[in-house]
Amino acid sequence: MTDTRADGVIGPAAPGEPGTATGRPGKSGRFLSLATLRTHWLIGALLVAGLVLRVLALIAYQPALIYVDTLKYLYGASPGSDPLGYLVVLRPLLLVGNLTVVAAVQHLAGLALGAALYVILLRRGTNRWLAALAAAPVLLDAYQVQIEQMIMPDVWFEVLLVAGLGLLLWRPVLSVPVAAVAGLILGSSAPVRQIGELLIFPAALFLLVAMAGTGRVIRTGIALVVAFAVPIVAYCSVSYVRTGHFWLARGQSTVGRVVSAADCATLRLPADVRPLCPTPAEQRFGPDWLEHSKYSPLFSAPIPPGAKRGQLISELTSAIKSHQPLRIAGGIAGDSLRLFSVTRDPSPWIAPIWRWQFQTHYPVYPHWTQLGPGNAIVVGVQTKLFGPFHFSVLKPSYGGPAQVNHPIASFLRSYQLDGGFTPGPLLALFAIAGLAGSVLALLRRGSPRTRALAVGGLLFTGTAVVLLLAPDVFEFSWRYMLPATVTLPPAGVLGFSALLSLGRKAGETPDGPAPGPAAPAS
């Protein structure tokens, strides 16, 4: 049997306590449940609040929210632009239900993320109040709830991420089989969102810092790397058979980022390339517009007869990278700080934030989605960039016409815009604490408990750096910042707990002095 210790960690129950064979018969389950609820009441309250938000989202928007990228998974739009691992979850759910069922399951996954983070941090030795603090953002952040209501793969990427990191941290000593399973799970995130390819780097760093013994590190590292590669290679192999391309997807271009940083007035360019270089007014529309809009000078500027536009764009970006690299780096650095801003205001520079906010109406994205007679959802499928759209009504099996419960939608929107998201300064504090814990881990300072907390903080902090900084190399989007809710809070809590542990006297626990030897049972 297990019970909850004073520090909030689930462990063996002491003899004679409720829940053991020597406790009061017939009441062990009730005592255990009451004790657990009393001990973990805060995470319980957060889970209930998170559940209420998700039920409201389900009621507010029927059958679910559909975004431009949703059509890639439902109709095969824009083939090759993103990996399609999401279909492994989506197709079975659509066999038994419609898009509402998919959204409901995604909301359950969001709740599970909060519970999982709480348990992982308790297992690692944090205070239960701090563990609940780390779980609160993913449970209560309206941007997280909105993406769960949308038919998009993001929540499943987070599930695989937290599951893989949790396995790496589950036991004090990482075994080869557990490392292999963790690698397999983390590698499976890449076919869901391509940025998952980068997760091997923080995981490998964790192994190097957390484990002792060269032989053990090598064996465990090989198991992790090989297992990580298996789902990626498998997906790429299937892609090669079907499309002739051994890839997850064609990958995102840096063209928009590079040309948005250019000072075209001082840049030396060939005469046939110069018309493609954007003016300051055009640059204010940001990297996304410059790279994807047909009105961008990259695609609208006249070119000489016989010239290839793609070659001219390549010459332009090469010149900018060679002569103005600091301007590119400055643009990336500036966007990387947006996550920590006090407010989330619309900006023409970045992808419109309203895409990730609850609306009082059913959101549409002409020509990709729009509403027809009777609020029927009409989708426009485009198979190539700037190609023609093929329109049809949403398949009946996916759900009926768009329906919005306006009072609930208004409440959700007000909640989101009036503070129902994780504040940027709080995320900054989490990041600073996580970095401090990472320094402790790298310096190998403190007691075994301190180091366990510090290396856990290192793993989550490294993961956050990879997942949050890498997208900024291409363009900033609030959607790409969503993994912050499942990486920065646990990183900060683990780092802060490591600092507390470092300053605590030996023999103390997170909740006070260590208990003395238990009296023998009478």
List PLM regions with ranges.
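Start-transfer (signal-anchor) and selected internal transmembrane alpha helices
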Residues: 1-54, 220, 224, 456, ...
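Transmembrane signal-anchor helices characteristic of membrane glycosylation enzymes that use polyprenol
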Residues: 38-65, 139-140, 227-239
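Membrane-interface anchor segments at the N-terminal boundary of transmembrane helices
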Residues: 38-41, 97-104, 330-460
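Multi-pass, polyprenyl lipid-linked donor-dependent membrane glycosyltransferases
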Residues: 68, 102-111, 136-163, 168, ...
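Short hydrophobic/aromatic helix or loop-helix immediately within or flanking a transmembrane segment
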Residues: 75-108, 483
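Transmembrane-helix signature of polytopic, membrane-embedded enzymes
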Residues: 117-140, 158-159, 172-181
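Membrane-interface alpha helices of multi-pass inner-membrane proteins
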Residues: 135, 179-193, 227-235
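Membrane-proximal stem/loop segments at transmembrane-domain junctions that anchor or position
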Residues: 248-397
